[in-house]
């Protein structure tokens, strides 16, 4: 699954809401998917440890986290009601470009894991 993500991730590091959309679909970003995936990749990398797979998954998690920081983080907005913009819960029902609490949670978890925290937070 991690390799699939690596092969379908846009250059900016923020996944599209379905990772592999047909050209006819609007390419909404999904920051919540990026946050969940980045947190999971840090965990996967830790399971593998140093070496080819661990280093590859850490680099992918870093790319995704940097993409979220640069493109979706709204923590400098005093009026923001969340941490990340551009969450996509159910695009077909118009639930795109949203703030999603679970995206914020996993964003915080990914940030913590990126600096070495390894305890689960839930």
Task: Describe the predicted segments one by one.
Residues 1-122:
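Glycan-recognition and catalytic cores of secretory/periplasmic carbohydrate-active enzymes
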């Amino acid at each position: 699954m991690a390799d699939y993500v690596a092969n379908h991730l846009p250059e900016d590091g923020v996944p599209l809401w379905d990772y592999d959309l047909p050209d006819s679909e609007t390419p909404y970003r999904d920051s919540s998917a990026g946050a969940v995936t980045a947190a999971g990749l840090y965990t996967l990398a830790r399971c593998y440890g140093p070496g080819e797979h661990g280093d590859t998954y850490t680099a992918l998690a870093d790319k995704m986290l940097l993409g979220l920081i640069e493109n979706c983080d709204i923590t400098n907005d005093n009026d923001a009601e969340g941490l990340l913009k551009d969450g996509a819960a159910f695009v077909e029902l118009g639930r795109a470009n949203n703030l999603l609490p679970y995206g914020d949670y996993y964003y915080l978890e990914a940030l913590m894991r990126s600096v070495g925290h390894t305890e689960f937070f839930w």
